[in-house]
Amino acid sequence: MKKHWIAPAILVFSRLLLLLALPLEGMVGYGDFIHFFRIANLAGWPYIHYWSEFPPIFPFLGELIYRLSAGRETTFDTLLILVLTVADALNLYLFSRLADRLFQKEEARVRLGGYLLCLAGLAYTWWYFDSIAVLAMLLGLLWILEQQPVRAGVALGLGILIKWFPVLLIPLAIKKTGWRKGVLTGIIAIGLSALVYGGLALASPKFTAASLQSQSAKGSWETPWALLDGNLTTGNFGPEIERLDARTASRTDRNPAVIPTWVTLLVFGGLGLATFLRLKVQTDRQIISFGLITFGLFFLWSPGWSPQWILYFLPPILLALPIQTAALLGGTIILANLMEWPVLLSRGMFWTLPMTIGIRTLLMILLVVAAFQSVSGGRE
């Protein structure tokens, strides 16, 4: 048990050193902390008095941190960084347990060291709140592999209430635990999130509906579909003050989709279903490779992409793929996303989006192919 806490302790120590040594503005950097603070500064509570583009857990957490900080931005930023540091430390702990389950001692250490290096050096982990959703995802994954469907369902349900992406582990649960337990995991996960959204809808139907509508209404960004639609922009919404008006959630200045999203969903959904039915998985590592395929297909279909979403890929890449492949593909896709944001787009160089999107999409395809080879009997 104690050995699993060594890497988390190193991460916490290194993060605290950064927090003590750097100006707070340097830590906040090119992330979304200003956006989070301004949203929390709005009067009232998310989903009740204003709409939010995020699922409810983080907006409520942000509001709580704002109130604990007495509205002081520096205190808000510091507390949020500490919360994200705890989440990253727990992610390392869970990754360590997963690695020990899959590999011999020395290889598990190498892969854990790679993940520690990513979390310690990649600013996305403290610029955005995705580390909290990754925590729910890894916890759900561990409990799926341990065949604990109820616990896995609760973890994934909480993850869905942070970011939608952990729902993608439900097919993995069915593959690992069979239809009865896997469907139970899915029912609990979706039921928990539906229960929370239902309660919010009863409290404020207008702003809950606006919150749910906001992401689907904003159009495409930073993907091949966005290039096709002529949307050379990021996924940001308008000024925070607009969230006090539920009608603004459905407004967008982006071009509509040239190819309707439901059409591309049929194509990629069909690929996903064929993969689910055809691939035979036997080992836990192959199960994680199957999950990597699922994530890859989903994000190849997705109308939008944000560079920090690479955080959802790093654990399965390091757990599923051969170590040389994991290092090469993982390192390259990290660099490609950093080049996109913050290096180029923060400087207004949106004309480079066709290049960065093309590189990332190619890497995503290679990732899916590598994961498919891992499941279907490729190199371990």
Language model features with spans:
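Multi-pass membrane glycosyltransferase architecture that uses lipid-linked
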Residues: 1-219, 257-380
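Proline-centered turn/helix-capping motifs that create local helix->coil transitions or kinks
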Residues: 203, 233-238
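Juxtamembrane membrane-water interface segments that cap and precede transmembrane helices
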Residues: 63-75, 236-255
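Compositionally biased, intrinsically disordered low-complexity regions
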Residues: 11, 221, 237-240
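Short alpha-helix
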Residues: 224, 228
